[in-house]
A protein has these predicted regions:
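Contiguous, structured surface segment used for ligand recognition
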Residues: 1-142
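Stable alpha-helical elements in mature extracytoplasmic
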Residues: 51-54, 58, 114-117, 159-162, ...
């Protein structure tokens, strides 16, 4: 693979029709329909733009992927692929795919159904690796919709090419952070332009509310206030699907005495922190009224708009309090529930919990199951934060977590939640983006009817990606990585630190050698235009304690052993991929090389995550030591660890240079490209020359 410039990944990520898809040795089986250049794509004159776009997309697909030139005509008496509407189909976005000798019909319930039907035909031919299709007559329905994602191209950036990529990945709704009319956290955005262009690709657009809302619903001017914000927004964007709300960005001056009644940054009394939670982190008794105010204001301008409220911020609250909140929750508002957060587990008998988005939680936590069950019983429609587009905070600056067997476990539990509690709407990623991958291909096939068995589908995908000879080895490699994710450590200090940025994470010497009484935390260097940038990176590694897990000093030895096991399994997966590589046909090899390259980068991140825990334990033992001789031995270990981490960072440079998506995350921008890895090396070298050398001098004082 060649070296890429920063952001060059964008030229790859939006490619949906791939040269070399067709197997030159493929031959039709008995009874298969063969599409050749005698066929025509039929798009009726005056067709909806989405149907016309489907015709153009299919024409490009056959030209690029199948090496066939097919014309588009409004009618044809000969062999043809016909695009049509069939309004009698039951569900929106559904389509019928009928293939018979000389004719293939894609009939959508609506124009969006035609768009997804076009992709469905492409998927069949992609798996066949040839323009051959079996006779069939099948109605396809989406089991989950909406499937919503933030941009994987750049925060709130949706060029046409990326909208097209979303469609082909089986996703159906864009999510745009919204701070005001045509405003996002990174500046101006013509939101109506996004809405209209997305519509042309069969996609909806959901607003993620970062809007003013600090008003109590009982205040005399409450209606006027909420209408000035939310009614105004939907007067500007009447075609938006709806709005998403979440406690942390929807705080209000609650009168619930269990809370501070203030914003979390203002919850102080004479500078002393109030131990009560602030309203955004508690199921306040008056929160349902606030939600109803927002709903009424939205629906005044857009009667059919979805209003979604996320209870993520109080996952830790006991079930009875959460249930009481839901009893008063507006029934025509959707409740959003996070799959993974709060899942409790024990590692070597030590209690811990998942603190944010993590594939470690292959199975759901009690918060998700109890909240979904209670919402459904109360007649409230549940929405899942599912992360089923493939990314999490496990490794914050990679395009997806390449552990498909573990994702399949999650998919099966989510599907059971759909059957049991109508959890049939997904927020498929947060702002860390998405990427077309084995994970999106699994989701596209599994979250529709007829539903494919995900384990068999994974085998099909592996054969399609890597060829029949290499597929078993690649599947075994993925299985090792999936097993490895069961040994990951999903704590806040890890997901806001070393695992968020990877091997560029700084190693700060914890004893504070200072003449200016300064603090040790340093600002991680990020682009000034970044949505969050350094604000969501904690550089001074330390345990972030909470009541759901044992303290860090008690957890870390077991977590280090767990990460060592993770690294061992990960390296087994790498070895299997290296063994598979020579068996992969040349036309498929780049995908495998990129998968392996990402696996090697993740290995570096695992090493950093393990080393920083050792670093913290050694630093704290050093601070606690009362014996200079013992302290000097500890300092030797710290110095050796620093040097090893420098080499680990240096080893990651080739991996990020070959794939410019590694080390980047939409809301932080670049955090682990070559520059940041070299910055980390300089930072640790500075610690060796400065703090560690000075502390050695201190210990040798006479």
């Amino acid at each position: 693979m060649k070296t890429e410039r920063n952001y060059e990944f964008r030229q790859r990520m939006d490619v949906v029709h791939h040269p070399g898809t067709r197997d030159p040795e493929a031959r039709p089986e008995p009874g298969e329909i063969v599409i050749d250049e005698s066929w025509t794509i039929v798009c009726p004159a005056g067709a909806d733009v989405r149907i016309a776009n489907t015709a153009a997309d299919l024409q490009d697909y056959f030209r690029v992927a199948m090496e066939l030139s097919l014309p588009i005509h409004p009618a044809s008496e000969g062999k043809s692929i016909v695009l049509a509407l069939e309004p009698s189909l039951a569900k929106p976005l559904s389509y019928r795919l009928k293939a018979e000798p000389g004719k293939i019909t894609i009939a959508g319930k609506d124009p969006r159904g035609v768009r997804f039907g076009g992709v469905g035909l492409e998927d069949i031919l992609n798996f066949r690796e040839a323009p051959f299709i079996k006779v069939q007559d099948v109605i396809h329905e989406r089991l989950v919709t909406p499937r919503m994602v933030h941009s994987g191209w750049g925060i709130d950036q949706f060029p046409d090419s990326h909208l097209n990529a979303m469609l082909h990945a089986g996703l159906d709704t864009c999510v745009v952070f919204t701070t005001g009319v045509d405003r996002t956290n990174v500046g101006y955005l013509d939101i109506n332009d996004v809405i209209q262009r997305a519509k042309n690709y069969g996609l909806d657009t959901m607003l993620y509310g970062y809007l003013p809302g600090y008003k109590h619903p009982d205040d005399p001017d409450a209606q006027e206030f909420f209408e000035s914000v939310y009614t105004n927004i939907f007067r500007h964007y009447p075609d938006a699907l709806g709005i998403m709300l979440v406690g942390e960005s929807g705080e209000f001056p609650s009168k619930d005495p269990a809370t501070t009644g203030k914003r979390h940054r203002e919850s102080l009394i004479d500078g002393i922190p109030d131990p009560r939670p602030s309203p955004g982190w508690w199921p306040c008794s008056d929160y349902p009224k606030w939600i109803a105010r927002v709903r009424d204001a939205v629906r005044k301008a857009a009667p059919n708009a979805m209003v979604v409220f996320n209870t993520y911020n109080w996952f830790w609250v006991d079930e009875e309090r959460r249930k009481e909140f839901l009893k008063n929750f507006p029934k025509d508002v959707y409740v959003q529930i996070t799959y993974d957060i709060g899942m409790r587990y024990k590692r070597e008998g030590i209690p811990s919990a998942v603190m944010d988005y993590s594939l470690f939680a292959a199975e759901p936590g009690f918060y998700f199951t109890s909240e979904s069950k209670n919402a459904h019983a109360l007649g409230i429609k549940p929405f899942a934060t599912s992360n089923t587009a493939g990314a999490t905070w496990d490794f914050g600056d990679i395009p997806y977590v390449p552990a498909p067997q573990r994702w399949i476990t999650r998919f099966k539990h989510l599907d059971q939640a759909r059957r049991d509690w109508d959890v049939s709407r997904y927020y498929d990623n947060h702002h860390y983006g998405w990427w077309q991958s084995v994970i999106t291909d699994l989701g596209k096939g599994y979250f529709q009817s007829p539903q494919e068995d995900p384990d068999e589908l994974l085998k099909k995908i592996a054969r399609r990606y890597f060829g029949a000879e290499a597929a078993p080895l690649m599947l075994d490699a993925w299985a090792k990585w999936s097993e490895a994710m069961g040994h990951y450590t999903p704590g806040n200090e890890d997901q806001y630190g070393p695992f968020r940025v990877g091997p560029s994470y700084p190693f700060i010497f914890q004893p504070n050698i200072t003449r200016t009484m300064g603090q040790k935390e340093i600002q991680f260097p990020t682009a000034p235009h970044a949505h969050f940038g350094w604000k969501i990176i904690k550089t001074f590694y330390q345990p972030y304690e909470n009541i759901q897990q044992f303290p860090g000093k008690m957890r870390y030895p077991a977590e280090i052993r767990s990460l060592e096991k993770m690294l061992s399994l990960w390296e087994e997966g790498i070895a299997l991929m290296e063994k598979a590589l020579p068996l992969i046909p040349a036309r498929k090899k780049e995908r495998a090389e990129r998968e392996l390259n990402m696996g090697r980068f993740i290995r570096c991140a695992i090493i950093t995550g393990t080393n920083i825990k050792r670093w913290w334990l050694l630093n704290n033992a050093l601070v606690a030591s009362e014996d200079p001789a013992e302290a000097l031995k500890l300092l030797d270990k710290i110095e050796a660890l620093a040097k090893a981490e420098i080499e680990n960072a240096r080893s990651a440079i080739p991996f990020v240079e070959q794939d410019s998506r590694l080390g980047w995350e939409p809301s932080m921008e670049y955090v682990c490209d070559r520059w940041h890895l070299e910055w980390k090396i300089r930072q640790v070298e500075s610690v060796l020359r400065g703090d560690i050398a000075a502390y050695r001098e201190i210990l040798n004082l006479k």
